[in-house]
């Protein structure tokens, strides 16, 4: 990519991207429902309408078939997230974009260093967005970057959150340079210390990615050997997860044993490991996407263009994402440990499997057993 714009968060990089492509009132943009909220919420700031799409059952990524179903004459763009580091099906998505003349924004916040058929994510679409938030493998505490090959997108994105010196250096076109002194009203500048931290983390990024993938591939092998209620996350052929932001196995103990995932996670936590439920609930199950933004619009005059066109999803509208979310656990990513620690973690899984009757009895006593 020719251009890179450093900003103060991954959210700001996405807002800059949406503003950069000139997304506006009356436009629709197709989005994953299974993603972190910041992939989509900046769209409201552009007065456009996000249209949520279901996910693939095996990766959690946006489903190309559902993308096709949601395209209308108002559709301007697609934003995708490479969830938990697994690249989306770029061949199918790019073909859809080409056929319908749609712009593509990649949210790569989970996928530093990930590749699809040998090509880095973030370089397929019109814009790539990355987060350097505290939990990312490259971090500035809170920072982000937007990359693109399009000069106009770059200049518009810069003017959204930068002014004076940064914009004087970046914005060269006659169309936009007259706004360089003021920008368009926001301050998205990256903090110098955040930039210094992120640059330092890039120095050994490849090695840290290598270690994490080796460890998690080993964990997947061991989990699948157990043949228990846990299924290791898949990585498709020609895909490389890069930073592997989250290791999210699928859990089938609710169907097999009647034990809810949060109880199983607590049992593993009692064995000394950081295990939980992923926080990224499908967006269509959140209040903002179930008509809640009506309240937001009513006291924020800038949103009035959407007052009569609010979003009103409900449970069951995007069933694959609901299924995926309900069956996903969050395991440690084991970046800086030796194989012995991973072996102990696998032994903990095996121990719970061998003593599952105690867990089932606990659920029956506490009223959370599924018959």
Language-model region placement:
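Conserved PLP cofactor-binding pocket of PLP-dependent enzymes
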Residues: 165-175, 218-229, 264-328, 358-370
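Basic phosphate/pyrophosphate-binding loop/patch that engages nucleotide-derived ligands
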Residues: 95-103, 145-165, 259, 263-273
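Conserved N-terminal alpha-helix of the aminotransferase class I/II PLP-enzyme fold
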Residues: 1-10
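Conserved PLP-binding active-site segment of the aspartate aminotransferase-like
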Residues: 236-238, 244-256, 275-294, 326-340
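Short, proline-centered helix/strand-breaking motifs
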Residues: 32, 319, 331-333
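Active-site region of PLP-dependent enzymes
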Residues: 111-117, 124-246
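PLP-dependent aminotransferase-like
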Residues: 19-108, 115
């Amino acid at each position: 990519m020719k251009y890179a714009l450093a900003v103060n968060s991954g959210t700001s990089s996405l807002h800059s991207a949406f503003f950069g492509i000139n997304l506006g009132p009356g436009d629709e943009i197709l989005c994953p429902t299974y993603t972190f909220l910041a992939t989509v919420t900046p769209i409201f700031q552009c007065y456009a309408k996000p249209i949520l799409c279901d996910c693939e059952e095996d990766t959690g990524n946006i489903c190309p078939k559902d993308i096709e179903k949601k395209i209308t004459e108002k559709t301007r763009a697609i934003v995708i997230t490479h969830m938990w580091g697994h690249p989306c099906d770029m061949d199918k998505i790019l073909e859809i974009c080409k056929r319908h003349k749609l712009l593509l924004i990649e949210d790569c916040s989970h996928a530093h260093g990930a590749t699809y058929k040998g090509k880095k994510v973030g370089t397929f679409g019109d814009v790539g967005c990355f987060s350097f938030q505290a939990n990312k493998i490259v971090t500035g505490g809170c920072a982000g970057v937007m990359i693109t090959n399009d000069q106009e997108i770059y200049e518009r994105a810069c003017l959204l959150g930068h002014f004076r010196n940064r914009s004087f250096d970046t914005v060269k076109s006659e169309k936009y340079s007259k706004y360089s002194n003021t920008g368009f009203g926001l301050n998205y500048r990256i903090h110098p210390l955040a930039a210094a931290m992120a640059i330092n983390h890039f120095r050994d990024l490849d090695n840290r990615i290598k270690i994490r993938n080796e460890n998690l591939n080993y964990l997947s092998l061991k989990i699948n050997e157990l043949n228990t209620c846990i299924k290791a996350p898949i990585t498709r052929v020609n895909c490389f997860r890069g930073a592997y932001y989250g290791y999210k196995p699928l859990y089938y103990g609710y169907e097999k044993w009647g034990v809810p995932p949060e109880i199983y996670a607590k049992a593993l936590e009692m064995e000394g490991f950081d295990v939980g439920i992923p926080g990224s609930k499908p967006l269509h199950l959140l209040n903002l996407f179930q008509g809640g933004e009506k309240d937001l619009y009513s006291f924020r005059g800038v949103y009035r263009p959407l007052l009569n066109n609010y979003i009103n999803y409900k449970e069951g509208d995007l069933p694959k994402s609901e299924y995926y979310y309900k069956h996903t656990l969050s395991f440690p990513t084991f970046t800086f440990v030796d194989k012995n620690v991973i072996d102990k973690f696998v032994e903990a899984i095996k121990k719970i499997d061998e003593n599952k009757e105690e867990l089932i009895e606990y659920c029956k006593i506490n009223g959370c057993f599924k018959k």
